Amino acid sequence: MKIDFKKYIPVFSAIIISLVFLLISIGFYAKKNYGTKYVFIFPCVDEGKYVLETRYLKENPNKSQLNYFVDELVLGSGLERTKYLFTPGTKVISCFERDKTVFIDLSADIIYMGHNVVQIKNGIELLKQNIMKNFTNIEQVQVFVDGKYAFE
C-alpha cells in the first residue's frame, strides 16, 4: 500500500505554521519585561505584624529606581488591612544617593497624624528598612522633613 503524501501537505503545513506561531508567542512572553522586583514592608492593622507586598517597577525615564521606589513606598500599600507609613498627602521633595547614603526630604504633611497611620518615628524606621532591604548597596539613610533633619 502506497501512501499519498500530497493530500497531507495542507495538514502538515497547518501544523508547522501553528508550531512557528507557538514558538514566536513563547519567545515574546519570555522576553516580556515586568520590571525589577521589589518587596515592600508595610505595617498591618494588627499591632506588631507586617505585610509584605511584591511589586514590579519598570524603569522610569524621569526618575532613578531609588526615587521611584521611595515614591511608591510613601504612597502606601495596595493591599487591605495595612497602615500608611506616613499621612496621605506626604510627598517626597527630594531623594538622592551619595557615597552609599540616601538622602530623603519629605514634605511637612508628614507631621499631621491621620487615621490608619503609624507613628512618624516608626514610619521613618520602616522607610529605612525598606530601602536597606531592596537596595543592598545602600549603607545609610538620612531622612529630612521640610529640610530639617528628622529626630535630631
Give the residues covered by each predicted segment:
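Bimodal "functional hotspot" detector
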Residues: 1-152
